[in-house]
């Protein structure tokens, strides 16, 4: 089912165009405009491989509901894929380019996990640190035994949003943290996995703030982005970068039996309405609201794929990364109703497909974005899009449709780079 758009012409009446016709024309324009800029913005890109991947992105925009897409990949520490297609803002006729920022929903969690592991390393923390040692209020209503390990593994028992929550709370960090601290656990601490869609970011981010003194947004910028030269990873977009942000569009609503109360998304999945607000774009939402370019996300994972170092800059010791990716649970998730391989903040690889690798880790997000590292292949990859659908369909999210855009793009990257899969 396609929306109709009116196209002005020289006659007295307007011609009605389908969404697909509009997007096809805009995508062709955007692709033509970007062809000459690929190698100038990413000098390490192999043009042959990049052209193959870009063609796949363009076909997704033309033949499916997808609107704007980016993918970037590092191999052996070098940027080898940096491709994009489609529109960042269809209404304004603004195409995607390599610098466009996308709201990547829960893909943000993987970057947040990296911040937490670096905080643990810098401050000599234990993953079994009781949260109440740094955040006493969190112990209310039977949560006094919750630990940092549980927070990273979605086992603090509070996946539900605070009482009275509305999307306006997303731009009020202190209010969200007070509300989460006052929650009563729905599941036994440390015994049941229940995906903390929003709460994961606030719980871990507040632990970091109380330990380190900086917000997690500041920590990400100062400890990861600046040392690695990443331009395109934000937990709250500054004023100067607002013009880079892609407009989010909602796809079909969540299934009728989906309990939106637990993940903080309104019934019917009006995600775009909330996350297209300037106040929300500029808020720190480390569980599900980071804004990234695929290039920035991939560079972060390239560092992890090389066990903590990139371009001679060491961010994390290899031992810390190995501790962070150690499997914590492969149990039934009470929210998503699938078995999920979870490390400390990262998802682990699938049983089949490109990520059937013993060392692959990363995270997916609603809408189908993803980022991951595969040290065995020395690969870091990021995929961004602005058409938001309920199911992630991600390469690191086993059980999703095999022909989801995320899997199609992953396969295209592997094929273009002639990587085994």
Role assignments for model-derived ranges:
Residues 98, 103-107, 119-163, 181-182, ...:
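Active-site helix/loop module of the DD-peptidase/beta-lactamase fold
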Residues 2, 44-87, 192, 209-231, ...:
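Catalytic loop of the DD-peptidase/beta-lactamase superfamily, centered on the K-T-G motif
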Residues 18-27:
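N-terminal export leaders
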Residues 59-72, 91-151, 188-198, 285:
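Short active-site loop at a secondary-structure junction
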Residues 1-17, 30:
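N-terminal secretory signal peptides
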Residues 165-170, 178-182, 186-188, 193-195, ...:
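Recognition helices and adjacent regulatory flanks at domain boundaries
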